[in-house]
């Protein structure tokens, strides 16, 4: 077994537990760490329940969220797992993406079946782009009637299908987190079965370097005799010297140019990768043709838009947000990547106003186009102060 220590090549995945309050998300998280620790002691340490339950508060863009992070390994993979103690913490985490999830374990108590927060979490998972779900039907030891278990399973599958997840096909594993924590061998096996389902059914996400090149522009300056240089952190993909790129966003027309040189820390590079803070020299571009807030992209891979639907969390007064509600036609700034753009908010029918601390859907019309795709995160600001955070759920124009 000593060999396992040396394996650093395991794929790394981010997952989390979602579901209704008191259905056993935190107990399940603790049970996973315990059972994997018992089976693979040299790979895992057990994290006790109370340590997960008293999750530290984090600030993501000024929003206070309690999140517990645990890590563990199966034979195949290394997992970072997030669990939020409170319902509001989930909503905030999912909308702001404070902890990104490549997949989720939906915990449903067999004794209750799907409850209101089960639905809300699944809806949010769909909207914010959590791509895969595996179901843990928890407290299965407390239901003796096989028919009831089958009915609850059917209900969960229907709920998932209604939100466009493959409800008929995804795995539903019957577990008892509490019994597994107490050391019951049969139910410990159910946790292993659950993790096998996660290993097999939550695929690895594409790596950032495999996605098409995109770099938000942070700064622009001209170097005498050489031309115009733009700097920024490459968000995804790879760019090579002498490749053609498009500059899009903010202005109505795109600009096409060639990257003639790439530098990082004043050293010349042949290519820039996702995560690099790079300076790109652009051929035939004048200083005034580009500005902060635009994006440099692989031609044709992303388009600028002005109108979209979003799921948004509005900061509470305690988090430094607004003290008063806002109404239809609210006009704050929307901060995308590196810049603010003013937009007009349209609230969904039946929503008169939005209070600080609420989450809501909205439609936004920006006064300038921004390079965007579904899932893009933004902050809502008033005079430089963050009052909300959101994600694009659908592009309209």
Curated annotation (Swiss-Prot):
SUPFAM superfamilies from the entry?
Answer: EF-Tu/eEF-1alpha/eIF2-gamma C-terminal domain, P-loop containing nucleoside triphosphate hydrolases, Translation proteins
Annotated Gene3D superfamilies:
P-loop containing nucleotide triphosphate hydrolases, Translation factors
- Localization of this protein: Cytoplasm
- EC annotation from Swiss-Prot or TrEMBL: 3.6.5.3
Name the segments for region: G3: 83-86
Q: Which residues form a coiled coil?
A: none
Which family does the record assign? Answer: Belongs to the TRAFAC class translation factor GTPase superfamily. Classic translation factor GTPase family. EF-Tu/EF-1A subfamily.
What is the protein's name according to its record?
Answer: Elongation factor Tu
Biological classification of the source: Bacteria, Bacillati, Actinomycetota, Actinomycetes, Streptosporangiales
